[in-house]
């Protein structure tokens, strides 16, 4: 019986699941948005949101806890220097899941998971070269 067992197994063993969510959390922190299945996105939210809450209070102990969970110094730096300050006034709900159809091949429901209030990068203006008329 599976009484009081929370979280999805996702057809993986525990070490594979832990490594997968560590990599996905690092990618989401670095890029701001990633595309994955809906089930993985919902589980990733459970992994990442406590890390961002931890990053709101910058201390050596919190940085070590974050590093123990991510194993990436660059991600810890982004968490504490950028995301902690960005979400200082927000009491939770740092991620948004947007469904985006189904994957070709196995029709798995796909979704984008993104950080809310992320800065919008404007596209560079396209340079149109004028052809020389002779």
Swiss-Prot record:
Keywords: Ribonucleoprotein, Ribosomal protein. One of its GO terms (biological process) is translation. GO terms for cellular component: cytosolic large ribosomal subunit. Gene3D superfamilies: Ribosomal protein L17. InterPro entries: Ribosomal_bL17, Ribosomal_bL17_CS, Ribosomal_bL17_sf. Pfam families: Ribosomal_L17. It comes from the Bacteria. The keyword tRNA processing does not apply. GO terms for molecular function: structural constituent of ribosome. HAMAP family: Ribosomal_bL17. Belongs to the bacterial ribosomal protein bL17 family. Part of the 50S ribosomal subunit. Contacts protein L32. This is Large ribosomal subunit protein bL17.
